[in-house]
């Protein structure tokens, strides 16, 4: 079911029933639970949305939702002409924790909903748009901070609340690479940086990069670059002379 297009920004409190409803709409929607939780499904993703998180649902994104028990949710509906987020960034929605920025936004939106006016909504929507454009995804941040640990699609998909089968295609939309290639490229760049900047032995470098021994590091690096790490380092030093 496609909801009609929207002309004006709407900010109001809503409640949901225990029965699942499904639809999509031609405008953006933000959900800020105030009480209780919302069970929500989009393509490849299942979320139990609580008051410490919010969810952005992009236009044309089919979603199912319900809430069991007492609930109240602050909802912001934004017409397409007022805010358009690039599809590759939005995917099937953005869920994030309420950090100080989003907590402030929720408070200001709540005040607008109480007043029943739209005086500041356009300005708040612009703040929200700028924030979303610079949004960083939790699983990508996790990769960077756990680069040389064992990383699985299952684990990364869980962080984003996606099904593993959907996660890889979603990830490629965000980065232009598969998760495996993205991780491999990051690891290789870090290995090159360490070989260039550090004076430690190759054994120490390989251990820092998470390899069990020097031979496995050498095989991996040679396969990735076409030359062994010792030759790569010597080439760097000779180029600097």
Curated annotation (Swiss-Prot):
InterPro entries (alphabetical): Cupin_2, Homeodomain-like_sf, HTH_AraC, HTH_AraC-typ_CS, RmlC-like_jellyroll, RmlC_Cupin_sf
- Give the keywords, sorted: DNA-binding, Transcription, Transcription regulation
Q: One Pfam match, by short name?
A: HTH_18
Task: Outline the extent of the HTH araC/xylS-type domain.
Answer: 137-235
Q: Where is the Cupin type-2 domain?
A: 22-78
Q: Which CDD domains match?
A: cupin_YobQ-like_N
**Tell me, what is one Gene Ontology molecular-function annotation carried by this entry?**
sequence-specific DNA binding
In terms of superkingdom, the source organism counts as: Bacteria
What residues are annotated to bind DNA? 154-175, 202-225
Indicate what this protein is called per its UniProt record. Uncharacterized HTH-type transcriptional regulator YobQ
- The organism is Bacillus subtilis (strain 168)
Q: Which gene encodes it?
A: yobQ
């Amino acid at each position: 079911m496609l909801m009609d297009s929207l002309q004006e920004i709407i900010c109001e409190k809503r409640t949901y029933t225990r029965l699942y409803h499904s639809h999509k709409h031609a405008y953006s929607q933000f959900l800020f639970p105030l009480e209780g939780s919302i069970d929500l499904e989009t393509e490849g993703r299942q979320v139990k949305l609580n008051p410490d998180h919010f969810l952005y649902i992009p236009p044309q994104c089919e979603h199912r939702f319900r809430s069991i028990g007492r609930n109240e949710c602050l909802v912001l509906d934004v017409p397409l002409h007022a805010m358009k987020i690039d599809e590759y960034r939005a995917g099937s929605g953005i869920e994030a924790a309420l950090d100080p920025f989003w907590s402030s936004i929720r408070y200001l939106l709540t005040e607008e909903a109480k007043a029943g006016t739209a005086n500041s909504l356009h300005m708040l929507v612009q703040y929200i748009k700028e924030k979303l454009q610079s949004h960083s995804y939790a699983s990508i941040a996790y990769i960077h901070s756990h680069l040389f640990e064992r990383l699985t699609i299952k684990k990364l998909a869980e962080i984003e609340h996606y099904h593993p089968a959907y996660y890889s295609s979603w990830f490629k939309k965000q980065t232009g690479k598969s998760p495996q290639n993205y991780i491999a490229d990051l690891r290789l760049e870090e290995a090159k940086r360490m070989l260039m900047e550090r004076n430690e032995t190759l054994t120490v470098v390989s251990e820092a990069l998470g390899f069990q021994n020097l031979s496995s590091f050498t095989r991996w690096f040679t396969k990735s670059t076409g030359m062994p790490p010792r030759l790569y380092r010597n080439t760097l030093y000779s180029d600097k002379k």
